Amino acid sequence: MPKAFAPLTATFLSAFLALNLLAVTPANSWFDKGHRIVGLIAQAHLTVGARKEIERILPGGMTLADAAVWPDHEGRQIREFDPLHYVRIPELASGYDQARDCPESNCMVEALNWFSAAVADKNAPIMMRRLALRYVAHLVGDMHQPLHAGRAADRGGIDISVAYRGATTNLHYFWDANLVDLETGNEEEIAKRLTANLTAADRLKWQAGDPKQWTDESLMLVRSHAYNTGASGELSDDYVEKARPVVRRKLAQAAIRLAWLLNNALK
């Protein structure tokens, strides 16, 4: 197992494990929608062996979609885990560099590496594997939302106010949630529609890479699409229509990669 990131020390471990004992009632806040869609699609692409092991690791009745939203709710009780949901990369950098961007290993790239290894470790305590599985399911989704690899100066778009058709929010929230909410249907219907649009070539091509590569892909998209808001902060219909296919593709891509990662980890 790789070296643990800074927050995962003996000081906090007991608290992390205690969180696993909490009753989990998945919330319905709308930013959960994207994570649940990723979990639903990924669930359908698991091997029989991986599915059985996930059922053994997670508490009774919890699905991969439920696990994917857990870190944004019960997991938020541990503030030291907050930086694990993103990485901040300098505006002119060509890609993620751990020494520069994550020297303490407390960002989504290194956390996903560590949690993936923990899921795969059959000698690890079941409670640790449970915690790790929830974070793997969540962080793969975060990693495919471009602004989770956004600039430090605006906290990945959180400090950029935007408006669309009279409703104001921030740029990060707009990509996290509003764009997903524009899709018609409930989570299951959207997941089925995205799955139906997948090609065999997509599935094959996306089952590759690692967290660094996936983060670099998001970095390119955050520059080519997300930050092109215009000076006024009023998002145009053209901006939204260009962003929506990006969001659909990244949801599907995250799901296929999550399933691929778990299928390999749980062989």
Please provide the spans of the model-predicted regions.
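N-terminal, motif-rich segments that launch catalysis or mediate targeting to/interaction with membranes
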Residues: 25-139, 146-267
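N-terminal secretory signal peptides that target proteins for export/translocation
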Residues: 1-7
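Bacterial N-terminal signal peptides
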Residues: 9-23
